[in-house]
Amino acid sequence: MSYYQHPSAIVDDGAQIGSDSRVWHFVHICAGARIGAGVSLGQNVFVGNKVVIGDRCKIQNNVSVYDNVTLEEGVFCGPSMVFTNVYNPRSLIERKDQYRNTLVKKGATLGANCTIVCGVTIGEYAFVGAGAVINKNVPSYALMVGVPARQIGWMSEFGEQLQLNEQGEAVCSHSGARYVLNGKILSKVDV
C-alpha cells in the first residue's frame, strides 16, 4: 500500500487509490472509486462507487462524494460541502437510474458548506464561496456566492480576486499572471 490509511477508515476491495494519498479517520471508500495520487480525504469523508477524484485533490471533513461526481486535478472541497446526485429525490420513489453527472474541473475551489446540485459543470479554477448553492454551470475562473449562487467576479489560478480594467484585462497581484475577458469567457494569457 503506497498511501496512508487511518485504522478507522474503510476501503472496500477494488477501490483504486494513488500513491502518497492520505485517508483519514472514519473515511469510507466504495469498491468502484478511482482516486488519484497525492489526494487528502479528511475525517468522515464518503466516496461512492462511480466517483473519480483526480491527483492532488483535497477533500475536507464531512464531505460525501456521491456516484457520478468527477473531480479533476487539484480540486478543493471545503468542510461539510454537499454534492447531490438526484435532482428531485423522494424517499418512496427509486431514482438510482436518474443520477446526473457532475464535473468539477481542474483547480476549482468549493467553499465550506456550499451545495452543488447535480448535473452541472464547474469550470477550471472557479471559486464557489462558503454556503453558496450552485444549480447551473459555472464558467472557468468565476467567483460565485449566494443562494442561488450568482457570479460577482473573477478569480486567478492563485486564488485571488481579479480587478479587471476597462479593456477587460487583469494581472494577479501575487503571481503576475495575466488574464483577459472576451465576452463572458476569462482566459489566462500565456506570456
Swiss-Prot record:
Gene disruption phenotype: Cells lacking this gene are incapable of producing either long-chain B-band O antigen (> or = 2 repeating units) or semi-rough LPS (lipid A-core + one O antigen repeat).
Enzyme class, broadest EC rank: transferase
Annotated catalysed reactions: UDP-2-acetamido-3-amino-2,3-dideoxy-alpha-D-glucuronate + acetyl-CoA = UDP-2,3-diacetamido-2,3-dideoxy-alpha-D-glucuronate + CoA + H(+)
PANTHER family: ACETYLTRANSFERASE, ACYL-[ACYL-CARRIER-PROTEIN]--UDP-N-ACETYLGLUCOSAMINE O-ACYLTRANSFERASE
Family as reported in the entry's similarity comment: Belongs to the transferase hexapeptide repeat family.
Functional description taken from the UniProt entry: Plays a role in the biosynthesis of B-band O antigen for serotype O5.
Known partners and oligomeric status: Homotrimer.
Protein name: UDP-2-acetamido-3-amino-2,3-dideoxy-D-glucuronate N-acetyltransferase
